[in-house]
A protein has these predicted regions:
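Membrane-cytosol interface segments of multi-pass membrane proteins
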Residues: 1-211, 216-217, 327, 332-333, ...
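Membrane-interface helix-boundary signature
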Residues: 14-27, 65-72, 222-231, 253-260, ...
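Alpha-helical transmembrane segments of multi-pass integral membrane proteins
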Residues: 73, 234, 239, 261-391
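Membrane-interface micro-motifs in multi-pass membrane enzymes
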Residues: 73-75, 169-177, 225-238, 296-297
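Membrane-interface helix-boundary motifs at transmembrane edges
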Residues: 97, 136, 188-197, 244-256, ...
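Extracytoplasmic catalytic-loop and juxtamembrane helix elements of membrane-embedded
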Residues: 137-148, 221-222, 227, 282-288
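Transmembrane-helix signature of polytopic, lipid-linked glycan biosynthesis machinery
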Residues: 159, 208-221, 270-277, 312
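Surface-exposed beta-loop-beta
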Residues: 211-229, 236, 243, 247-251
Length: 404
């Protein structure tokens, strides 16, 4: 009896959880915060540097996160990669563990409950404010088109509603998510049967469309975020989930795999920094968009290695990402993403600022005041909508109790 109990205890210590990967909450939270930082920086031009006297022995006197704030939007790719990973995880468990996946109807019902209530609330409120402030004055046809396309997740089909919406620019990401949901059951089943073939087709088709087709159909700002350009990102996310569950069924959290995972996470983090710096050095927005199209596959590979490495890394390393603070941020991350840019823009506008230069001219204290106020309001709004609208409505749609 004691021997069996010891074996069960040992198995629980070294087993890998394939139902909930804790570090993903931390990665999601940090990804959203990077995007938030970029949009806040656009409005305030706040560029702090941090003194590091404790690193003086290594010749590092200060840390300047300029690269991160200038190209933090690249973490949108990370969040889409995470979506593919999480969505495919049950299918990977079916392949390697023999578990069941939800029927297609249940899959769509859960996706609807997850994103639509908060999204529709945001669209309606932001549109109403835009109308009240005269954003559509003299543009009645566009006003109707902007609303209808956003309500139907089709705004990216039209250049005007994608680039010049009166609602908020970040909504395009939800369109990409919805497009992924619509085809995901087909992709997941194909990936489950022929993972290497499906992965190769998704990557090659996505790269071909991005490099060969996109330049002929529009300028970079129009084509950079089309659904097909993200196929390699989705493929890498699905492959990451596939490899993670494969690992979980064959290897346990012992010393050597954990050390190798930690090394892989550190190395990939360095590569991500190098890629971010390369994008920042590309030039203005249009040149950075060209860089994105040319390097999206490489960046998503670096993100993939980081996800896998961090997920199987040593426990102290995993705890950096898998903790209550980042989990709390991850819980409200969807609404934080939907609202943060709109809120900081409205805050700066209320102060009479027309650009980041106006806030910067008010001095560093003004920049910090606006930033901290914006963060406070953004998190408060995100929490209120998450727990006041998203979760209650989701429970009604799914007919589940509070504990679920």
């Amino acid at each position: 009896m004691r021997t069996n109990a010891l074996r069960l205890k040992t198995a629980s210590i070294f087993s890998v959880d394939t139902k909930h990967v804790g570090v993903l909450d931390g990665v999601r939270a940090l990804g959203v915060l990077c995007v938030l930082w970029f949009h806040f920086w656009q409005q305030t031009w706040l560029m702090p540097m941090y003194a590091t006297p404790f690193l003086s022995w290594a010749g590092v006197q200060r840390i300047n996160p300029d690269v991160l704030r200038r190209v933090g939007y690249l973490c949108v790719d990370l969040m889409l990669l995470l979506s593919a990973f999480v969505l495919y995880l049950p299918y990977a468990r079916r392949r390697f563990c023999g578990t069941q996946v939800d029927p297609v109807s249940t899959f769509f019902k859960k996706r609807f409950a997850r994103i639509v209530p908060s999204y529709l609330f945001a669209v309606i409120v932001m549109y109403a404010v835009a109308m009240a402030q005269g954003a559509y004055k003299g543009k009645a046809v566009f006003a109707l088109k902007d609303l209808l396309t956003h309500l139907t997740f089709t705004q990216m089909l039209f250049n005007d509603t994608y680039l010049f919406t009166g609602i908020t620019a970040v909504m395009w990401t939800v369109c990409i998510e919805v497009a992924l949901y619509l085809v995901f059951p087909l992709l997941a089943n194909a990936f489950g049967r022929r993972p290497l073939l499906t992965y190769g087709v998704m990557v090659l088709f996505g790269v071909w469309f991005t490099i060969c087709v996109s330049p002929a159909f529009g300028e970079p700002r129009i084509m950079v975020n089309r659904f097909l350009t993200f196929l390699p990102v989705f493929a890498n996310g699905m492959m990451a989930a596939h490899l993670y569950v494969w690992y979980a069924e064959r290897v346990r959290h012992k010393a050597i795999p954990s050390i190798l995972g930690t090394i892989a996470a550190a190395a990939s983090l360095y590569m991500i920094f190098r890629l971010f710096r390369s994008c920042a050095a590309a030039g203005d927005a249009s040149h950075q968009q060209v860089w994105q199209m040319q390097n999206r596959m490489f960046l998503s590979l670096a993100f993939t290695v980081f996800l896998l490495g961090a997920s199987i890394s040593m426990k102290p390393v995993r705890k950096i990402l898998d903790n209550k603070v980042l989990s709390a941020i991850a819980a409200v991350s969807y609404n934080l993403y939907l609202w943060h840019q709109w809120l900081i823009v409205k805050l700066c506008s209320a102060l009479g600022a027309k650009s980041g230069a106006d806030i910067a001219n008010g001095g560093v204290s003004m920049q910090w005041t606006v930033t901290i106020t914006g963060l406070t309001v953004a998190f408060a709004v995100a929490a209120l909508i998450t727990y006041g609208i998203e979760k209650p409505v989701s429970r009604l749609i799914l007919n589940t109790g509070r504990e679920n």
